[in-house]
């Protein structure tokens, strides 16, 4: 033990409880109390009675609880000496510098609650603070416990939690000066108080009872062990030797434990590319079949994402650019149960073709998650018809059923050899000459903004078995006599035919997209196709070598022709789409160290600033990823990866603002926002940033001589600008430059600037289907709103009346990304872990709605009509950038 440590932890002279009481009574007389009176009568918790330091008789905390139970059991009470010595290896929580830790010591009774509490002094800028403060408590050993909570003092926001230790008092030893080795300190492992807490390190404590009635022999042989479950270490000689907590069970194969940029521990399943907060156990290890099911689920979710033009053009007027191949279905395609004995239509809806081709590809490849037996007919050439597959009837997810534009899900329009149109219901495997009746309502062809004021009479008749009634308070509700239930929502609002073609989007992303497609130049001096022969097990390495081996990037604009080793199949677009899904899964996997999850959730990505430490050729890989992204945009395909908003802004060479930081790192945002709105001079901040790398803290100057420049009211805007530049731009400048170099080899930089950052995400990742019912089911309400509130009814009515793009825009507005978690809105994440979508009543009707992307919260004023809510919500979504209400 070092000399300074020994000096800090020198043993105090032993005082009996009677001596302590005598001293307190003397102090009572000096302080004006009545001689001989009970000390507890003059004490008011949580304050201490009098102050005493048994080492030097200088003032120090001596606390006696005012628990009435003590008076009845005075013979059972003891005085415990608690010494808070030090903290070791605490977590760093202060983003503007080292932590400022202090300890709150609370004596409590599990039955009656807190008895008294005291706080140590704050040690500035230290992760290994030394307090050396003593406290005396009068306690009932069998009833009372002491809770030690460590916090990081923060002037900008609330104090950060660094860990806690809860110690029972009955097993503590009694001080005995005759012992050759006096009782020494113990290091307690700091524990979290919830799964969201990020803690590490130890709290060094010394806890002993004073001898009772002057008896030095009492409990001399008492064991010094605490109750089972606490990890401690008795270390009289080696202060640097730390205890090790019990080894947790090993992770299942393919799993890895990591910490995000906020220090939160999460677990990565590299086989399924999934993450979770809960530590998996070997018993939770997924079978191959389970992994295949999740893989197929991810593929299905990826397949349903589309470009804006894929679901709005009819089959008759659809253009056939090079990136979309029109495929004729073979006449002999059969469905078990009832075959459709008629030729296919001359044009197949693109979304329908992609779904069929993707399913066919999975079946041909023998995907273990696909259990249908497949029989394939021979084909003579690559340009021939699609191979015929006969599938045994299996449950099929509706999302993959072929669907023609303008028809209900699962319905497809076809033509026979005479050119007559008929309709296939893939849900029931039946055909009919009649167009589905739910589409016959002519109102479905009128945009919602041209229908005039929304009225129940405009929605047509109620479905069979439904009745509309008026409640005593004037609100309208609906009765479903079929199942004998009532609800507030109008069932007609869920009729896609009535609410389908909603308000055309004023930003007109569709027109931008079509203009963009027309301006992309088709190369005439390149081969007809670009072939890639790949191995599934080495798809990243094979793709990297093939694409980076091309010196002239224009060759990548040729039609993609992809073959997987050992598989026979035709690539009419489906295999290329599958390749983009698989290569995205590999490129963006944090396992390779090129990307990492953002601070907000575990499904949006950002470039890893330390990627060079993981891969020496990281810049070459970023150029490769840029080329792949450019190929996806050029060929009209999609990437399975969603990035933070500043990433898209950097691609567009737009300035990143403080607002962009909120959805990425809420702690940084809150701190910088406070600095912007207040005078930071008293904080003694400098133009430096502390960065932790592999457990060591490094200082980075934001400008030359920054360590000597104090942040004041005059230069705080410059400080905030430099922090944002460092956080998003400077640290990844080389990686981003390599990515853009590869991307702009295929896509003209000036042409991409017609989009904003939200539209660029849709261009690269596509539009997904938002399940409004799932969204609504996993929504919380605050500050007066509830599921049955009239404004909430109007809000969900508005969401149901939106088209797919507008719903995605609303999702981007409130969460910062167009990505819905694979398992739905139940797994939506915010800055502090799982965070459900929340609608909170706020403001007055003259205000626009505002969003808090780090909390997935929408502040919605109490509007007085549906039309007012509709107009204000549209305005807020479309004018996010210049809208002060969004923070």
Curated annotation (Swiss-Prot):
Region (Disordered): 236-257, 271-290, 302-322
Tissues in which the protein is found: Brain.
Mutant phenotype after disruption: Lethal during late gestation. Embryos show a retarded development and defects in vasculogenesis and angiogenesis.
GO cellular component terms, semicolon-separated: cell cortex; chromatin; cytoplasm; cytosol; glutamatergic synapse; Golgi apparatus; membrane; nucleoplasm
Cross-referenced InterPro entries: C2_dom (IPR000008), C2_domain_sf (IPR035892), E3_ub_ligase_SMURF1 (IPR024928), E3_ubiq-protein_ligase (IPR050409), HECT_dom (IPR000569), Hect_E3_ubiquitin_ligase (IPR035983), WW_dom (IPR001202), WW_dom_sf (IPR036020)
Active site per the UniProt annotation: 854 (glycyl thioester intermediate)
Protein name as it appears in the record: E3 ubiquitin-protein ligase NEDD4
């Amino acid at each position: 033990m070092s000399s300074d440590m020994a000096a800090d932890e020198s043993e105090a002279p032993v005082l009996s409880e009677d001596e302590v009481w005598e001293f307190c009574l003397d102090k009572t007389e000096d302080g004006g109390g009545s001689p001989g009176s009970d000390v507890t009568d003059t004490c008011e918790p949580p304050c201490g009675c009098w102050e005493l330091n048994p080492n030097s008789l200088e003032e120090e905390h001596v606390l006696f609880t005012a628990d009435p139970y003590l008076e009845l059991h005075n013979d059972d009470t003891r005085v415990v000496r608690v010494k808070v010595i030090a903290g070791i290896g605490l977590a760093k929580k202060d983003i503007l510098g080292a932590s400022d830790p202090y300890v709150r010591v609370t004596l409590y009774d599990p039955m009656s609650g807190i008895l008294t509490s005291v706080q140590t002094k704050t040690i500035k800028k230290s992760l290994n603070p030394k307090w050396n403060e003593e406290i005396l408590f009068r306690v009932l050993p069998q009833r009372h416990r002491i809770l030690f909570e460590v916090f990081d003092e923060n002037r900008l926001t609330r104090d950060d939690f660094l860990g806690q230790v809860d110690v029972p008092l009955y097993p503590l030893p009694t001080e005995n000066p005759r012992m050759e080795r006096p009782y020494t300190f113990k290091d307690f492992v700091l524990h979290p108080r919830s799964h969201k807490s990020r803690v590490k390190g130890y709290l060094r404590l010394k806890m002993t009872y004073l001898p009772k009635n002057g008896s030095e022999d009492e409990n001399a042989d008492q064991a010094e062990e605490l109750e089972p479950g606490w990890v401690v270490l008795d270390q009289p000689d080696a202060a640097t030797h730390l205890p090790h907590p019990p080894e947790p069970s090993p992770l299942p194969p393919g799993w890895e434990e990591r910490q995000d940029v906020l220090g939160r521990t999460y677990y990565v399943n590299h086989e399924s590319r999934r993450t979770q907060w809960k530590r998996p156990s070997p018993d939770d290890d997924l079978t191959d079949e389970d992994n295949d099911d999740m893989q197929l689920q991810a593929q299905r979710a990826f397949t349903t994402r589309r470009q804006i033009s894929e679901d709005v053009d009819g089959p008759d007027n659809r253009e056939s650019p090079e990136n979309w191949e029109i495929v004729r279905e073979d006449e002999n395609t059969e469905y078990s149960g009832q075959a459709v004995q008629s030729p296919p239509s001359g044009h197949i809806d693109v979304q329908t073709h992609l779904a069929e081709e993707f399913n066919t590809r999975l079946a041909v490849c023998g995907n273990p998650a696909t259990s249908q037996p497949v029989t394939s007919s021979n084909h003579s050439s690559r340009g021939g018809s699609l191979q015929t597959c006969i599938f045994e009837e299996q449950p099929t997810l509706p999302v993959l059923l072929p669907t023609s534009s303008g028809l209900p899900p699962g319905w497809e329009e076809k033509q026979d050899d005479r050119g007559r149109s008929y309709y296939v219901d893939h849900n029931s495997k039946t055909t009919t000459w009649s167009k589905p009746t739910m589409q016959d309502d002519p109102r479905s062809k009128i945009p919602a903004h041209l229908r005039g004021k929304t009225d129940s009479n405009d929605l047509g008749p109620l479905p069979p078995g439904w009745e509309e009634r008026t409640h005593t308070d004037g609100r309208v509700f609906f009765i479903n006599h079929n199942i004998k239930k009532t609800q507030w929502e109008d069932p007609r609002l869920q009729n896609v035919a009535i609410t389908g073609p909603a308000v055309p989007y004023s930003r007109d992303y569709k027109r931008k997209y079509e203009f963009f497609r027309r301006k992309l130049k088709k190369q005439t001096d390149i081969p007809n196709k670009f072939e890639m022969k790949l191995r599934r097990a080495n798809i990243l390495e094979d793709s990297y070598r093939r694409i980076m081996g091309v010196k002239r990037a224009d060759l990548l604009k040729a039609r993609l022709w992809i073959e997987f080793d050992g598989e026979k199949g035709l690539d009419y677009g489906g295999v290329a789409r599958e390749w983009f899904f698989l290569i995205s899964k590999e490129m963006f996997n944090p396992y390779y160290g090129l990307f990492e999850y953002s601070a907000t959730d575990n499904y949006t990505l950002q470039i890893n600033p330390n990627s060079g430490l993981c891969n020496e050729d990281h810049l070459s890989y970023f150029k490769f990823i840029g080329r792949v992204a450019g190929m996806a945009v050029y060929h009209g395909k999609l990437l399975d990866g969603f990035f933070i908003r500043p990433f898209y802004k950097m691609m567009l060479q737009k300035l990143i603002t403080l607002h962009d930081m909120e959805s990425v790192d809420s702690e940084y945002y809150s701190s910088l926002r406070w600095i912007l709105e207040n005078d930071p001079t008293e904080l003694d901040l400098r133009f430096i940033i502390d960065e932790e790398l592999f457990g060591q803290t490094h200082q980075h100057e934001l400008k030359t001589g920054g360590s000597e420049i104090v942040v004041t009211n005059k230069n705080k805007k410059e400080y905030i600008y430099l922090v944002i530049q460092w956080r998003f731009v400077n640290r990844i400048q080389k990686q981003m430059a390599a990515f853009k170099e590869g991307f702009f080899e295929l896509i003209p930089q000036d042409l991409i600037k017609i989009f904003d950052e939200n539209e660029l995400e849709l261009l690269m990742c596509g539009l997904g289907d938002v399940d409004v019912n799932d969204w609504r089911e996993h929504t919380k309400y605050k500050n007066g709103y509830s599921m049955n509130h009239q404004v909430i009814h109007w809000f969900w009515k508005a969401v149901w009346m939106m088209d797919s793009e507008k719903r995605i825009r609303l999702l981007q507005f409130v969460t910062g990304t167009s990505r819905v978690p694979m398992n739905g809105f139940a797994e939506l994440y915010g800055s502090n872990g799982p965070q459900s979508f929340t609608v909170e009543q706020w403001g007055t009707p003259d205000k626009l709605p505002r969003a808090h992307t780090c909390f997935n919260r929408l502040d919605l004023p109490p509007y007085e009509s549906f039309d007012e809510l509709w107009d204000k919500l549209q305005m807020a979504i479309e004018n996010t950038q210049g809208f002060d209400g969004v923070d």
